[in-house]
Amino acid sequence: MRVLAIESSCDETAVAIVEDGKLLSSVLSSQVNIHRKYGGVVPEIAARKHLENILFLLDEALDRASLKIDDIDVFAATQGPGLVGSLLVGLSLAKGLSISLNKPFVAVNHLIGHIYANFLSFPDLEYPFLVLLVSGGHTEILLAEDWNNFKRIGKTRDDAAGEAFDKVARLLGLGYPGGPEVELAARNGNPIYRFPRALNEKGNFDFSFSGLKTSVLYFLKNNPEARIEDVAAAFQEAVIDSLLTKTFAAAKTYGINKIVFAGGVAANTRLRERANEIAKEKDINIYFPPIEFCTDNAAMIAMVAYEKAKRGIFSPIDTNAIPYLSIVSL
């Protein structure tokens, strides 16, 4: 079974093809350089750029897989969450192809796609496992009990971790997107300052990063002589410490010995280093997607679509975008 999937939930336009769960091609066009001057994604511009790029990427994905459009058995696209204008570009194309070629259509939850990015490298990964989903818009700890059964056991009460990186990057005068910029600065810094870790009570697996952001703001006002690199390193350590302390504690509480990392922040090198150190201490198996599949891509969407399609689970052609789709929906 060949599945062609489209991802257009935010500012990356992507198309990928999998055959029986194996990746044949994956292409992507990023808009990061376009949105950088605005300090964030401009929805209207993002949707317009998706329209400009999507057909070229469709042809390129087919060419790289040495396939024609008639060779595709199932078409899929991200349904949400995301920017509604952006989502509609991918959904409209996938549904149009489905109608014109009389092939099934599958709508995919973008967040579950991030989890499934791990199956690209670890196809034999078995349930149950714990998930730390950490990105620009979401920070959650989930118990994955089966391919379509996700139980949320912790979430952010305010800012997502990736959002905190972006906001602190602006405070530090760094560029966009904030995550890579803060990480780069932190490599040349020393985490000599101590920023707060919120919600530390035992058994609480929720996160909070707004207070951390505010703490950095006031620290910079009161300590203008502080090196940006040191502040970046200290902030990064605070975020990573909070993420990993709660995630490994949740694994112990629920008796799970496998932790899967997902989302754009999972590309952070320091997060990976610390996670590996703790995992060795606690004898827990951890899984990270390849760096290129941590951020938005269509390969992860195709993997979810394949799992649904092989079970005969398809979506109605009048499926619409759901900008605030929850991960507990599939």
Curated annotation (Swiss-Prot):
Q: Which residues form a coiled coil?
A: none
> Which CDD domains has this protein been placed in?
ASKHA_NBD_TsaD_bac
Q: Where does Fe cation bind?
A: H110, H114, D296
Which UniProt keywords are present, listed alphabetically? Acyltransferase, Cytoplasm, Iron, Metal-binding, Transferase, tRNA processing
- Gene Ontology terms, cellular component aspect? cytoplasm
Biological process (GO), any one: tRNA threonylcarbamoyladenosine modification
Read off the Gene3D superfamilies from this record.
Answer: 3.30.420.40
Q: Taxonomically, which superkingdom?
A: Bacteria
Residue sites binding substrate per the record: L133, V134, S135, G136, G137, D166, G179, N268
Pfam families reported for this sequence:
TsaD
Q: What is this protein called in UniProt?
A: tRNA N6-adenosine threonylcarbamoyltransferase
Source organism of the structure: Kosmotoga olearia (strain ATCC BAA-1733 / DSM 21960 / TBF 19.5.1)
Query: Gene for this protein?
Result: tsaD
